[in-house]
From Swiss-Prot:
Region of interest (Disordered), residue spans: 151-173, 548-568
Cell compartments where the protein resides: Nucleus
SUPFAM superfamilies: DNA-binding domain
Keywords noted in UniProt: Activator, Auxin signaling pathway, Developmental protein, DNA-binding, Ethylene signaling pathway, Nucleus, Repeat, Transcription, Transcription regulation
Protein source organism: Arabidopsis thaliana (Mouse-ear cress)
Tissue expr: Expressed in roots, seedlings, flowers, and siliques. Also detected at low levels in leaves. In roots, specifically detected in the distal root meristem, including the QC. This tissue specificity is regulated by auxin gradient and depends on PIN proteins.
Record's compositionally biased regions (Low complexity): 151-171
One example GO MF annotation: DNA binding
Biological classification of the source: Eukaryota, Viridiplantae, Streptophyta, Embryophyta, Tracheophyta
PTM characteristics: Stabilized in root meristems by reactive oxygen species (ROS) mediated oxidative post-translational modification triggered by RGF1 hormone peptide in a RITF1-dependent manner.
Protein family membership: Belongs to the AP2/ERF transcription factor family. AP2 subfamily.
Protein name listed in UniProt: AP2-like ethylene-responsive transcription factor PLT2
Length: 568
């Protein structure tokens, strides 16, 4: 064999120097054609790709004629054409014999994915060639994903039918999309309207209000900030409330609408801006600071509270100052909001807290909290005035109560004018009870005494001098009474003691004491019956003061002003 003929094609374009037996033993044919010709796939060997084990290459088919630049084939060499497979016969043969069909790469991959179990089964026929399928391991998953996404409906149905029939080789697992580690553009919360801040890790709630259009923006609507929250569920709840306020109960919420029945009733009396402001106040802090008030941030160095208001001087924020407390900074923001935005401004506190007229008429900012200070002064004056009114009302009530209470309390000085005959009476039909009954013996109704308040004051003034004389004359008896009071302190309260079987009455002029005695011969138990009388010198006859009869309670008058004690 000539050593120069190892190329399998003649070097001379006109004369062939190859012997005839080389042409018959050649199993492959390298045909170089145009770009639009059928190009073999570079991932497989030529012999493995184009061999039809069943002799499917049509004998009468013509191979497309192309320009033969190197002069490999001649028109008379028909014995070499049996190794070529016509283009039309490739599509008519079984798809399992070929891995890549000409230039249509994607449908072949689909067929490969659907017939994967058949590709690895060996044909045990000895005289037939084995169909060999090669694939890249690193690109198998990607090819399966492409096949799943790009397959036509007809091919998808064919894949489903082949996967159901060929169950012996194993089921085909559907390729799932691979998630990358980068979370950019993906949702950071399972709840609607909730996002997780990538730096702070806190959850923020936003609502897209598409009812307005901002200047300079092509997209309709604006983003409404609903506050920052430590828990994801709280942020989702804030979104639900804002969505119910904006779009009504027909909107989609994270939680059932039945959880917000109370809030739905409250939001009916508020506008959208007011309700959003109330939601933000209830949040655990805004994104720019840990303040619950609008427009208030905390300084990162000295910890004081700063107030700012945005979009009043162009697109920049207006600095309002630094304050010692969070509430003062919130008030400064409210004043600036009222100044720039009028009565429709969203404030931290109620707008009636401020002097709106003074704020709107002012030409300087910051107002320095002057409106708030003036309001605080007015509130202080109002509270002091109300306090004085309450004190005066309480003093008048105390005086009236003391005057009305003197009718039953013997320690009052007004009782010097009235002889109080007291008696302990016990109804005979209730003698088995041990509670004595204390009554006032009065000819008229006791309500008349309450009506005669002015009369008592007049009588007190008229008999002031006589009372002083009486006290001087009875000074020697007061020592005796004081000594007895020290040994019996219970009598200072004017009560009747059943345990001691004694009763007493205390007045400014003296005290009367009586011992227990029996009433009637049929009484089973003893009970005290005491009458005490201390008569003032009468001013004409035996008639007492205030409708009281002084003659009923004593066996005889006591002009000396000394008490008379006796037992009946």
């Amino acid at each position: 064999m000539n050593s120069n003929n190892w190329l399998a094609f003649p070097l001379s374009p006109t004369h062939s120097s190859l012997p005839p037996h080389i042409h018959s033993s050649q199993n492959s044919h390298f045909n170089l054609g145009l770009v639009n010709d059928n190009i073999d796939n570079p991932f497989q060997n030529q012999g493995w790709n184009m061999i039809n084990p069943h002799g499917g290459g049509g004998e009468g088919g013509e191979v497309p004629k192309v320009a033969d630049f190197l002069g490999v084939s001649k028109s008379g060499d028909h014995h070499t054409d049996h190794n070529l497979v016509p283009y039309n016969d490739i599509h008519q043969t079984n798809a399992s014999d070929y891995y890549f069909q000409t230039n249509s790469l994607l449908p072949t991959v689909v067929t490969c994915a659907s017939n994967a179990p058949n590709n690895y089964e060996l044909q045990e026929s000895a005289h037939n060639l084995q169909s060999l399928t090669l694939s890249m391991g690193s690109t198998g998953a990607a090819a399966a994903e492409v096949a799943t996404v790009k397959a036509s409906p007809a091919e998808t149905s064919a894949d489903n039918s082949s996967s159901t029939t060929n169950t012996s080789g194993g089921a085909i697992v559907e390729a799932t999309p691979r998630r990358t580690l980068e979370t950019f553009g993906q949702r950071t919360s399972i709840y609607r309207g909730v996002t997780r801040h990538r730096w702070t890790g806190r959850y923020e709630a936003h609502l897209w209000d598409n009812s307005c259009r901002r200047e300079g923006q092509s997209r309709k609507g604006r983003q409404v900030y609903l506050g920052g929250y430590d828990k994801e569920e709280k942020a989702a709840r804030a979104y639900d409330l804002a969505a119910l306020k904006y779009w009504g109960p027909s909107t989609t919420t994270n939680f059932p609408i039945t959880n917000y029945e109370k809030e739905v009733e409250e939001m009916k009396n508020m506008t959208r801006q007011e309700f959003v402001a109330s939601i933000r106040r209830k949040s655990s802090g805004f994104s720019r600071g840990a303040s619950m008030y609008r427009g208030v941030t905390r300084h990162h160095q000295h910890g004081r509270w700063q107030a700012r208001i945005g979009r009043v001087a162009g697109n920049k924020d207006l600095y309002l100052g630094t304050f010692s407390t969070e509430e003062e900074a919130a008030e400064a923001y409210d004043i600036a909001a009222i100044k720039f935005r009028g009565l429709n401004a969203v404030t931290n506190f109620e707008i009636n807290r401020y002097d709106v007229k003074a704020i709107l008429e002012s030409n300087t900012l910051p107002i320095g909290g002057g409106a708030a200070k003036r309001l605080k002064e007015a509130q202080a004056l109002e509270s002091s005035r109300k306090r004085e009114e309450m004190i005066a009302l309480g003093s008048n009530f105390h005086q009236y109560g003391a005057a009305s209470g003197s009718s039953s309390v013997a320690s009052s000085s007004r009782l010097q004018l009235q002889p109080y005959p007291l008696s302990i009476q016990q109804p005979f039909e209730h003698l088995h009870h041990h509670q004595p009954l204390l009554t006032l013996q009065n000819n008229n109704d006791i309500s008349q005494y309450h009506d005669s308040f002015s009369y008592i004051q007049t009588q007190l003034h008229l008999h002031q001098q006589q009372t002083n004389n009486y006290l001087q004359s009875s000074s020697h008896t007061s020592q005796l009474y004081n000594a007895y009071l020290q040994s019996n302190p219970g009598l200072l309260h004017g009560f009747v003691s059943d345990n001691n079987n004694t009763s007493g009455f205390l007045g400014n002029n003296g005290i009367g004491i009586g011992s227990s005695s029996t009433v009637g011969s049929s009484a089973e138990e003893e009970f005290p019956a005491v009458k005490v009388d201390y008569d003032m010198p009468p001013s004409g006859g035996a008639t007492g003061y205030g409708g009281w009869n002084s003659g009923e309670s004593a066996q005889g008058s006591n002009p000396g002003g000394v008490f008379t004690m006796w037992n009946e």
